Amino acid sequence: MKILIIHNKYQSNNIGGEDVVYKNELNALCEKLGSENVFCYEVSNDNINKFKLLFEIWFSKKHYKVICKIIKENDIDIVHVHNFFPLLTPAVFKAAKDSKSKVVHTLHNYRLWCISGILYRDGFGICEICAQKKFSLSGIVNKCYRKSLLQSFVAQLAFCFYKLTGAFNNIDYFFVLTNFQKNKVKSLGMDEGKIILKPNSLQMSFNMRIQKHNYAYVGRLEESKGILNLLEIWDKFDEKYILTIVGGGDIEAELRRKYKKPNIIFKGKCSREETMAIVSHSKYLLQPSLWYETFGLTIIEAMSAGVPVIGYDIGTRGDFIKDGVNGFLSGPDELKSVIEKSFDYIDYDSLSKAAKESAKQYKNEYVIEKQIEIYKNILENKI
């Protein structure tokens, strides 16, 4: 069995969870199947030429030809695509289909239904206005793609074109990451027979015996991630509640100016190693995201280090956080009281141990074995 993994990487100054998952998955597959059986093709948004992209975003002939060539020369059985937008385009799906390979696409976001990819709009909240339409002006008017009217227009037009031309019909199966996401994409009209639940995996090597203290937030600094709500709450706490914030974003400078308190520590963007050092030394990870999310990589990373997680009971959070077992779930108006309850929680050690145990099911070796089994079943038409 030979596999081709394809990914359109984000800009190097804005590496997202998708990039981390892609690299981790690629390495794990190479280790399990041998590098002679696993191939990769990647491009980066660092190399975007905006003028050329206006003409190539509809269907990239260049990438179509390259993918066809790779498949033919290496007898590829399965093509697994992570992100395809905006450089690769759905041309990669057609190339794989025309070359008689099976095609799998991991849904790391909701961009097939929403150009922002997150089904959330700043100042509005959870938003599915565009999800049931082939073309919607809402995403354009509200500048939902990169907060740009022009880029939102092009993105909306592109996905309308993809749908009208049946570009996604070339995908045999879609990998979803949680039960919540599976039910959500079904509700948005996806054929249940094409959906396969396959979570992300994680390389775990943390020592939970580290002395833990404080709270940590890891993520982009933007409204949809809940950082504004979190800081409004923290502003009311006394100084014994210490919050370390890892991440950057357009509103970072504004937040630093507004919240100059000794118990609110902005670290900015950190390397993966620095981030995990901060998380593993924290008593709790806070996950206050206001949108559904598709997975919870930071949640699993924290739990693998024995760090319980506190998050809103929205979207995928319930797939990972069991209230009072390995962390706490909060309603929209209860986060402050939940954090206060967590501070001197009498049974913290049990939370920590349960968090560590919860993360084990996402170990690389378990998930990759399952993934390989899924690949085999797809090739043998057993799904």
Give the positions of each predicted feature:
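Donor nucleotide-sugar binding/catalytic pocket of nucleotide-sugar-dependent glycosyltransferases
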Residues: Q132-F206, K267
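Conserved donor-binding/catalytic core segment of Leloir-type glycosyltransferases
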Residues: F175, N200-L202, N207-K225, L231-D235
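Nucleotide-activated donor-binding/catalytic signature segment of Leloir-type glycosyltransferases, i.e.
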Residues: E254-E273
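Short alpha-helical donor nucleotide-sugar binding micro-motif in glycosyltransferases
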Residues: K269-C270, I278-S282
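Short alpha-helical segment that forms part of, or immediately flanks, the ligand-binding pocket
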Residues: M276, I299-S304, G318-D319
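Acidic donor-binding loop of glycosyltransferase active sites
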Residues: S280-T294, V307
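Conserved acidic donor-binding segment of nucleotide-sugar-dependent glycosyltransferases
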Residues: D323-D333, K341-I346
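A short, well-ordered alpha-helix in the C-terminal region of glycosyltransferases
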Residues: D347-Y362, K370-E373
